[in-house]
């Protein structure tokens, strides 16, 4: 008999390091890759893995995310086990916990244990909703069952110099976790590989009994400590549970020949920008064109993109770029850029290495370089952005450490 697996996506992230993109939306709702939202990649991982029972746990500035999922992720009403359902923070355990919203990743699941009980899940796959990657969750589940683990953690080898931002684990020869350290300044390295650490991707599969016991022991009656990385996983190890690591690099993706090595935490503006730029290379490591692993999202029924004008010096053209429906390149040039729906670049404009969200207009003779422009911004004719840091900062734009300029949503020049 096929096991009952419930997916839970943690989508309550505030994403403060992505401000101003998260000024009016949560991190999982931030647009990415021309037509997607960050949350779409986690949902697609479940759907493409044949797992159709998914709760999305939301909290911070969730309206944009709510509308996106309600528009784009509906199965209908005929199959009760096929659902993508939003679960906002609602103080469900008020009598026990008092006046408390979700206080951490583990607490978000703890406050919704009734959903797991009602579903009668055998296994619960708890995944982060704010990373860019492809993952065959079914394969991870198979390894979880095969090793008879109580908890399985998706693991990603990373340079030790970067690993302090993540949970880091040590494993034995069978990849059973022996130690776990959450965001420590000097992370331990992989034995024999002094420059690499084995980091947690924030994706877990729990056997239901172990999840119930660990959440009850870790959270019930506590006043601090409500996270999987800080509290639940260390508790599982100290209490003798079988915690297994799963090697993400061995995760098979149908239709993909190269190893599955692409995983990006787009938690900073620079990381977010570079992940978008990854998509426009000739042969990107993260391939969004694999028909055997389709990437679905909300349909906006936009018209096709269009390129107009071809006179000398006034040609509508784009190079090494991707753009969504409704975009019009009207006598301007776009290079190495990612354009959202209904973007319009006017004559003699030049857009280089930019990420333009939906409904952005770039005026005539404007020049943009390494700029993220949020939705509904009209850039006047003759405007330059990204060419003079001091000028950009004087206009109130965020300029990152690596020189990426961010124009906030609805900015008026």
Swiss-Prot record:
Q: Does the keyword Mitochondrion apply?
A: no
- Gene3D superfamilies with a match to the protein in the record: Hexapeptide repeat proteins, Spore Coat Polysaccharide Biosynthesis Protein SpsA, Chain A
For this UniProt record, the keywords arranged alphabetically read as follows: ATP-binding, Carbohydrate metabolism, Glycogen biosynthesis, Glycogen metabolism, Nucleotide-binding, Nucleotidyltransferase, Transferase
Q: Does the keyword Isomerase feature in the UniProt annotation?
A: no
Per the UniProt entry, what are the Gene Ontology biological process annotations, in alphabetical order?
glycogen biosynthetic process
What chemistry does it catalyse, as a reaction equation? alpha-D-glucose 1-phosphate + ATP + H(+) = ADP-alpha-D-glucose + diphosphate
Q: Indicate which residues the UniProt annotation says bind alpha-D-glucose 1-phosphate.
A: 102, 167, 182-183, 200
Q: In which pathway does it act?
A: Glycan biosynthesis; glycogen biosynthesis
Which GO molecular function, any one, fits this protein according to its record?
A: glucose-1-phosphate adenylyltransferase activity
**From which residue to which does the signal peptide run?**
none
Question: EC number(s)?
Answer: 2.7.7.27
Coiled-coil annotation reads none
Tell me its family. Belongs to the bacterial/plant glucose-1-phosphate adenylyltransferase family.
Q: Which HAMAP family match?
A: GlgC (MF_00624)
On subunit structure and binding partners, the annotation says: Homotetramer.
Functional note: Involved in the biosynthesis of ADP-glucose, a building block required for the elongation reactions to produce glycogen. Catalyzes the reaction between ATP and alpha-D-glucose 1-phosphate (G1P) to produce pyrophosphate and ADP-Glc.
Q: What protein name does the entry list?
A: Glucose-1-phosphate adenylyltransferase
């Amino acid at each position: 008999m096929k096991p009952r697996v419930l997916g839970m996506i943690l989508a309550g992230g505030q994403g403060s390091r992505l401000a101003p993109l998260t000024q009016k939306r949560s991190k999982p709702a931030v647009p990415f890759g021309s037509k997607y939202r960050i949350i779409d990649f986690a949902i697609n991982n479940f759907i493409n893995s044949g797992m159709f029972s998914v709760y999305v746990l939301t909290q911070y500035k969730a309206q944009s995310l709510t509308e996106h999922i309600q528009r784009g992720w509906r199965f209908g009403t005929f199959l009760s086990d096929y659902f993508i359902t939003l679960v906002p923070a609602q103080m469900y355990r008020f009598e026990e916990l008092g006046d408390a919203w979700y206080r951490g990743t583990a607490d978000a699941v703890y406050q919704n244990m009734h959903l797991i009980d009602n579903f009668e899940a055998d296994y619960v796959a708890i995944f982060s909703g704010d990373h860019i990657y492809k993952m065959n969750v079914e394969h991870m589940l198979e390894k979880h069952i095969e090793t008879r683990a109580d908890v399985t953690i998706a693991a990603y080898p990373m340079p030790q110099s970067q690993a302090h931002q993540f949970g880091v684990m040590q494993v034995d020869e069978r990849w059973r976790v022996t130690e776990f350290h959450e965001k420590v300044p000097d992370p331990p390295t992989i034995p024999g590989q002094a420059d690499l650490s084995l980091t947690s991707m924030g994706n877990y599969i729990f056997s239901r009994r172990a999840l119930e016991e660990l959440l009850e022991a870790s959270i019930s009656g506590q006043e601090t400590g409500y996270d999987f990385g800080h509290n639940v996983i260390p508790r599982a190890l100290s209490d003798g549970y079988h915690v297994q690591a799963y090697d993400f690099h061995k995760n098979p993706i149908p239709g993909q020949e190269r190893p599955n090595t692409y995983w990006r935490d787009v938690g900073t503006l620079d990381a977010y920008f570079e992940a978008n730029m990854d998509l426009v290379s000739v042969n990107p490591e993260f391939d969004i064109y694999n028909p055997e692993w389709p990437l679905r999202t909300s349909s906006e029924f936009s018209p096709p993109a269009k390129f107009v004008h071809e006179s000398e010096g006034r040609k509508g053209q784009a190079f090494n770029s991707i753009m969504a429906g409704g975009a019009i390149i009207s006598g301007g040039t776009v290079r190495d850029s990612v354009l959202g729906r209904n973007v319009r670049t006017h004559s003699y404009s030049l857009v280089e290495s930019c990420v333009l969200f939906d409904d952005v207009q770039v005026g005539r003779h404007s020049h943009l370089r390494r700029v993220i422009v949020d939705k509904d911004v009209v850039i006047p004719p003759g405007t330059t952005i990204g060419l003079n840091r001091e000028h950009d900062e004087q206009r109130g734009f965020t300029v990152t450490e690596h020189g990426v300029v961010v124009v906030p949503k609805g900015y008026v020049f």
